[in-house]
Amino acid sequence: MTHMPVVLLGTGLYTPKDSISNDELVATFNQYVAQFNQEHAADIAAGTVEALAESSSAFIEKASGIKSRFVVDKAGILNPNIMKPQFAPRSNDELSLQAEIGVAAAKQALDNAGVNAADIDMVIVANSNMQRAYPAMAVEIQSELGCGGFAFDMNVACSSATFGVQMAANAIAAGSAKRVLIVNAE
């Protein structure tokens, strides 16, 4: 029995335009801590609420090695009253934000591989978190790029991408696909 060789032809990466340094993140967090502690001063003094402690850039770097991170929505994250990304809701008829990120990375990967989207016959999205359950992100990406074949999402927690690669290799080895696009849009 002859097995078709399985090779990785190209990779792509989506990098958001904005980044947040530890100093920026800590300044926002510490502003939130000051507001929280001030608003709950009486309860903190009574011992019914624990005061929040400030953080530092040095602590984040020592604990995680991270000095900065790329983000899609800097304004929401750096607002001490929000401290999370703010995204406009999208209907199921619109491309999800994660699918949009996946499409950008997939286009890069296809360009790097010298492969046309129409030559892809299997699309796997392997994420640990999905923005929404329906429509399947893989189908969104398949449709947006113009890929053929079939598409499905995989969710195997932190191992999703690894399982996606294994699933693609198995599909190629079994002959059910010739060219597989694997996307992790996280």
Language-model-detected regions and their locations in the chain:
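Short glycine-rich phosphate-binding loop at a beta-alpha junction
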Residues: 118-126
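Short glycine-aspartate micro-motif
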Residues: 5, 122, 178-182
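Conserved "HGTGT" condensation-loop signature of ketosynthase/thiolase-family condensing enzymes
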Residues: 1-119, 145
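Short linear motifs at secondary-structure transitions and domain/linker junctions
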Residues: 46-47, 98-101, 130, 156-158, ...
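Short beta-strand segments
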Residues: 9-12, 126, 155, 180-186
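Conserved catalytic cysteine-centered active-site region
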Residues: 64-82, 93, 127-180
